A protein has these predicted regions:
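An N-terminal-biased, well-structured beta-alpha scaffold segment characteristic
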Residues: 2-105
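Phosphate-binding beta-alpha-beta segment of Rossmann-like dinucleotide-binding domains, i.e.
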Residues: 100, 108-159
Length: 159
């Protein structure tokens, strides 16, 4: 992690890899510190990020506990913003973060459509036995259509 501002740019730490286009845009505007191995940060890494960066961008894999904030506070918390990548924030001790002067953001609503689409995918796969059919094809056991083969439930008209 950098020891100071590079070219007077605020230091932003990503605890996990983000989409490449986003990382490129961030690197143009900030002194960006990427997590090249894309593994969850340890408590020690989170403490280091809180004390050395201006902005920490955590994800659900980062346990920002009261203990992490207390350890960072003993050193001196530099970060002012936790820009959470995701909707959920139950991995962040909000009271401890606020007590240490951090602003916390998340992305509410960003997964609503995706969650509904995944639910529909699972519903259709179960009702129409799509997983079983795929396994037959992959094993080379597909013998073609016959009247009782892969009978399933119709979804149309159901609520």
């Amino acid at each position: 992690m950098g020891t100071g501002l590079e070219n007077d740019k605020p230091i932003v730490v990503l605890t996990r890899r983000w989409p490449e286009s986003v990382e490129i845009a961030l690197a143009q505007r900030y002194a960006l510190v990427r997590n090249e191995n894309d593994a969850a940060f340890s408590a020690d890494q989170l403490v280091a990020a809180l004390t050395q960066a201006d902005v920490l961008c955590p994800t659900v894999t980062d346990a920002l506990t009261a203990e992490v904030f207390a350890a960072a506070a003993r050193i001196g918390i530099r970060a002012k913003l936790l820009a959470n990548f995701g909707v959920g924030f139950n991995h962040i001790d909000l009271a401890a973060a606020k007590a240490n002067g951090l602003t916390i953001t998340n992305t509410p609503g960003v997964l609503t459509a995706a969650t509904a689409e995944i639910a529909m995918t699972l519903l259709l796969m179960c009702a129409r036995r799509a997983g079983a059919g795929e396994r037959l094809v992959r094993r080379g056991d597909w013998r073609g259509w016959y009247p009782t083969h892969m009978l399933s439930t119709q979804v149309t008209g159901k609520t």
